[in-house]
UniProtKB/Swiss-Prot annotation:
This is UDP-2,3-diacylglucosamine hydrolase. Substrate binds at residues 79-80, 122, 160, 164, 167, 195. The gene is lpxH. It comes from Salmonella dublin (strain CT_02021853). Gene3D superfamilies: 3.60.21.10. Pathway: Glycolipid biosynthesis; lipid IV(A) biosynthesis; lipid IV(A) from (3R)-3-hydroxytetradecanoyl-[acyl-carrier-protein] and UDP-N-acetyl-alpha-D-glucosamine: step 4/6. Binds 2 Mn(2+) ions per subunit in a binuclear metal center. It catalyses: UDP-2-N,3-O-bis[(3R)-3-hydroxytetradecanoyl]-alpha-D-glucosamine + H2O = 2-N,3-O-bis[(3R)-3-hydroxytetradecanoyl]-alpha-D-glucosaminyl 1-phosphate + UMP + 2 H(+).
Length: 240
């Protein structure tokens, strides 16, 4: 019995080794799990479910194959793929979840999320996030021709990279008070998230009790997953 969590794969055709590693993960580890949760940034960018990129179809088919053998797959949007919609969910068999979700995992209540909403010290990013998550802005963007959407997405990624290069690492990490507030709001002692690309298990106090924040790593030269069993919560790095 095990439930698996992954995040921040940033899949793109320019990184075939990561794509191949994820396909192997789906073919082996994922099929042995009780469930698979993908906590955002599965793709490096997403400009709409109507994008004919062959990689998207390949990944959808591979996830659907896992679902078809009886392993449910769930998805929380990240900051790179927040426009993944019902069409891709249907093609992949994934169940779309809200940005925060509490799970009962073998007797533990665990809060899961992508993690960008915890980085409240980065006021510039939070303001940008509020704009692009406006439903009207998203609807307008999705009405644009694909070639224009690609240009806008490329420009936004370049702008984000430039902005992040001038920010301190502390600003781009989670805010400790925000973490505690979220865990106490949901009355949990466990939090699993991604986004920061800083894999670790942090001990803290929430609800006047010991608590744990487990941060998934990004997939680069190795993969990263959290494996939750009735007896343990493990952060695992593995070769791709």
């Amino acid at each position: 019995m095990a439930t698996l969590f992954i995040a921040d794969l940033h899949l793109q055709t320019e990184e075939p080794a990561i794509v191949a590693g994820f396909l192997r993960f789906l073919a082996v580890e994922a099929r042995q799990a009780d469930a698979l949760y993908i906590l955002g940034d599965l793709f490096e960018a997403w400009i709409g479910d109507d994008d004919p990129n062959p990689l998207h179809r390949e990944i959808a088919a591979a996830i659907k194959a896992v679902v078809n053998v009886g392993v449910p797959c769930f998805f929380i949007h990240g900051n790179r793929d927040f426009l993944i919609g019902k069409r891709f969910a249907r093609e992949s068999g994934m169940i779309l979840l809200p940005q925060e979700k509490v799970l009962d995992l073998y007797g533990r209540n665990v809060l899961i999320m992508h993690g960008d909403t915890l980085c409240t010290d980065d006021a510039g990013y939070q303001a940008f996030r509020a704009k692009v998550h406006n439903p009207w802005v998203q609807r307008l963007f999705l009405t644009l021709p694909l070639f224009i959407r690609r240009r806008i997405a490329a420009r936004m990624r370049a702008g984000s990279k430039a902005a992040n290069s001038s920010k301190s690492l502390d600003i781009m990490d989670v805010n400790a008070q925000t973490v505690v507030a979220e865990m106490e709001k949901h009355r949990v002692q466990w939090l699993i998230h991604g986004h920061t690309h800083r894999p670790a298990v942090h001990e803290l106090s929430a609800n006047d009790q010991p608590a744990f924040r487990v941060v998934l790593g990004a997939w680069h030269h190795e993969g990263s997953m959290v494996k939750v069993t009735p007896d343990n919560v493990e952060l695992i790095a593995f070769p791709l």
